[in-house]
Amino acid sequence: MVYVLSDVHGRIDRFESILHQIDLNEDDRLYVLGDVIDRNAGGIELLFRLMRMPNATLLLGNHELMMRDCVVDGGNCELWLLNGGMTTLLEYFNLPTESMLLLWQYLKNLPVQVELRVGGT
């Protein structure tokens, strides 16, 4: 099965509940259409959770883009902070350096789109 979700915004409890409800297994694919961070605590944990899931693909949402612009590209953080990024920023800066670098690489390489063929070969 192919599953798609978006806008979890740090709610790892809801994310885990959804995975339990759909009984996601290794043969399934999960596409997350961005916005797993910000507004609530748990966004950084969600990013690492998705990184460890070989059958999950996170696409770059506007919140991940704002974080990437701020912490990866050294850009302006104001827009991100105005959109609920403070919780995520504090979680990020509490990470060990090695974890920051892993997350930095992950954010840098998130796809903006994927092409799926549904019901075809």
What are these regions (language model features)?
Residues 1-48:
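N-terminal active-site segment of His-dependent metallophosphoesterases
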Residues 40-121:
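Active-site neighborhood of divalent metal-dependent phosphoester bond hydrolases
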